[in-house]
């Protein structure tokens, strides 16, 4: 995947092999973002993926509308409101970003190298976004930065431009090994960052590479040993190479970027990140950490990764609405048994739109994807259990489509810039307001962007609206006339009964839905004991709730009792 990487004789000695550390928590949690390759078939798929990626990335820059400045904007706001202060427990001291900037919002006034400026012009960028204007100058000056910005704000360019300039000024060559590492929570976001970096480095001689779970590890190791100057990585695969790939030179590391730090920690990579930071050299390393939210865990990660006195940059005033201005948001209240019928009716009426539907689990995505395609409502599906080849192809197919429906888990909720999305449908409710904000952030991206979102809630889940209100998220209530909802319940039930594979898939989806529901953090809102399992089962095409084995701790017994009681009714 790295373009222009050439094998050279290295004068440096090989770094000492680090002792392999076992992940004691690895067997306890499932990670959708980094499954390992085990079969020959998948190995072949990934070799094919490697050869195809460069072709796919030719269009990536066009997909990243969040990084494109508004060329029609005639007047730039000169001041933002006072940035939010981090808690007393955070790194001390934090230096607040100066409200005044260089006085110009143009890239050409940053004093960048000729190859970088040529690439920026080739990509069609002229003016900086707020986060770029406030972040790039201090990073070019060598400061460590902790940044907070809304999704779609253009932070990818904000950290890549200084990183590439550093490699250029130090005249990095393949034999010097890796000088910059960018850590990303998901494969798709890593691929997207790789695409932007590839375009930015088009006129540079430095080398670029990517290591992600699900890709061919041997090919990755070969490229690392030849010398990758700027490396994009997901946490698990990066730690694997740091510990086990002999000939991977990282002793000359000059910059570490941690993107979407809160998401990295949320999906269970806290231990890996601590090990990565411990392994990497820190003496002359500049670090950049970006996070949409400043949690205690993010502050802990900042403490061990950033040097003393980092610059804190927040371009989101505390009183500002948390979602994009051009986003029209609403919710609909319906009982569990009507949820799928309403979704089907909505999708059928908006078949010419570009829509993303979020569900709570891989098996739910798999089932509803199979069901909708079976009943002639074409959809794409994206989830963490798919092979990397499938995930990548689906991602680019939906990005390039003018209309279509993508059913997915939260693997697509953070950071991905998918152009011209008309609707975001949250069929299964988000875990908290942060997840809601990142889901709806897939539409109305960039300055002047427009989009709509719709969230499905049952009557017992309406308490979630209080949390959204507290997070400055404005919602309208939508109503759908019952006579406009397609009544296909009897046909659905007959189909599930008569089709063995759909029946099994429906059963797996039903089980996964209950497990996901029981794992919600907001227990006062999402109370599994209040679910009407007969109605929930109907939404999956069952007359009565199927008997399923679910491991959800203390709630398991009460659910099984409820199953038995409601099957008798």
From Swiss-Prot:
List the GO molecular function terms.
ATP binding; ATP hydrolysis activity; identical protein binding; RNA binding; RNA helicase activity
User: Which part of the chain is the Helicase C-terminal domain?
Assistant: 326-496
For this UniProt record, give its keywords in alphabetical order, as a comma-separated list: ATP-binding, Helicase, Hydrolase, Nucleotide-binding, Nucleus, Ribosome biogenesis, RNA-binding, rRNA processing
Q: Which Pfam family would be a valid example here?
A: DEAD
Which Enzyme Commission numbers does its entry carry?
A: 3.6.4.13
Where, per UniProt, does this protein localize?
A: Nucleus, Nucleolus
Q: Where is the composition biased (Basic and acidic residues)?
A: 71-85
Q: Where is the composition biased (Acidic residues)?
A: 34-45
Where is the segment annotated Disordered? Answer: 1-57, 71-110
Q: Which domain of life is it from?
A: Eukaryota
Motif Q motif: where?
105-133
| Helicase ATP-binding domain boundaries | 136-312
Question: One GO CC term of this entry?
Answer: nucleolus
Q: Which reaction does it catalyse?
A: ATP + H2O = ADP + phosphate + H(+)
Query: Quaternary form?
Result: Associates in the nucleolus with the 60S and pre-60S ribosomal subunits.
Q: What is this protein called?
A: ATP-dependent RNA helicase HAS1
This chain is encoded by the gene named: HAS1
């Amino acid at each position: 995947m790295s373009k222009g990487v050439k094998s050279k004789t290295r004068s440096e000695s090989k770094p000492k092999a680090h002792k392999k550390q076992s992940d004691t928590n690895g067997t306890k949690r499932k990670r959708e973002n980094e499954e390992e390759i085990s079969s020959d078939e998948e190995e072949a798929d990934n070799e094919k993926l490697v050869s195809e990626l460069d072709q796919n990335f030719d269009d990536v820059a066009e997909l990243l509308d969040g990084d494109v400045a508004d060329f029609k904007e005639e007047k730039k706001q000169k001041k933002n409101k006072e940035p939010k202060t981090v808690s007393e427990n955070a790194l001390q001291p934090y230096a607040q970003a100066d409200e005044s900037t260089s006085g110009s919002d143009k890239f050409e006034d940053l004093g960048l190298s000729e190859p970088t400026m040529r690439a920026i012009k080739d990509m069609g960028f002229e003016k900086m976004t707020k986060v770029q204007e406030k972040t790039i100058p201090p990073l070019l000056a060598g400061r460590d930065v902790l940044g907070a910005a809304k999704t779609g704000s253009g932070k990818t360019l904000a950290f890549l431009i200084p990183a590439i300039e550093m490699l250029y000024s130090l005249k990095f060559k393949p034999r010097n090994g890796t000088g910059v590492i960018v850590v990303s929570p998901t494969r798709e976001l890593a691929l997207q960052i790789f695409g932007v970096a590839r375009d930015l480095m088009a006129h540079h001689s430095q080398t670029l590479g990517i290591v992600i779970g699900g890709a061919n590890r041997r090919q990755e190791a070969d490229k690392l040993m030849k010398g990758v100057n700027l490396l994009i990585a997901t946490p698990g695969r990066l730690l694997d190479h740091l510990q086990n790939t002999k000939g991977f030179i990282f002793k000359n590391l000059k910059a570490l970027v941690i993107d979407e730090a809160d998401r990295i920690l949320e999906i269970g990579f806290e231990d890996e990140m601590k090990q990565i930071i411990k392994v990497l050299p820190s003496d002359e390393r500049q670090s950049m950490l970006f996070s949409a939210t400043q949690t205690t865990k993010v502050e802990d990660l900042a403490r061990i990764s950033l040097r003393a006195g980092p610059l804190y940059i927040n371009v989101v005033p505390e009183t500002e609405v948390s979602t994009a201005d051009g986003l029209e948001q609403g919710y609909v209240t319906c009982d569990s048994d009507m949820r799928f019928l309403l979704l089907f009716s909505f999708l059928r009426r908006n078949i010419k739109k570009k829509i993303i539907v979020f569900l709570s689990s891989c098996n739910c995505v798999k089932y509803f994807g199979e069901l909708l395609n079976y009943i002639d409502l074409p959809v794409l599906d994206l989830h963490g259990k798919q092979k990397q080849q499938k995930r990548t192809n689906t991602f680019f197919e939906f990005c390039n489509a003018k209309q279509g429906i993508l059913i997915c888990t939260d693997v697509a909720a953070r950071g991905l810039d998918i152009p011209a999305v008309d609707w975001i449908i949250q069929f299964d409710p988000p875990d908290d307001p942060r997840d809601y904000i990142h889901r709806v952030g897939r539409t109305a991206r960039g300055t002047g962007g427009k989009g709509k979102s719709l969230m499905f809630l049952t009557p017992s889940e309406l308490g979630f609206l209080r949390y959204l209100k507290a997070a400055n998220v404005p919602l309208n209530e939508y109503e759908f006339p019952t006579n406009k909802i397609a009544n296909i319940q009897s046909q659905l039930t007959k189909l599930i009964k008569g089709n063995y594979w759909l029946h099994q898939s429906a059963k797996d989806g039903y089980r996964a839905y209950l497990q996901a529901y029981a794992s919600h953090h907001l227990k006062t809102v999402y109370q599994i004991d209040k679910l009407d399992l007969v109605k929930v089962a109907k939404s999956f095409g069952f007359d009565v709730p199927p008997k399923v084995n679910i491991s959800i701790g203390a709630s398991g017994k009460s659910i099984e009792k409820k199953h038995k009681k409601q099957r008798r009714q």
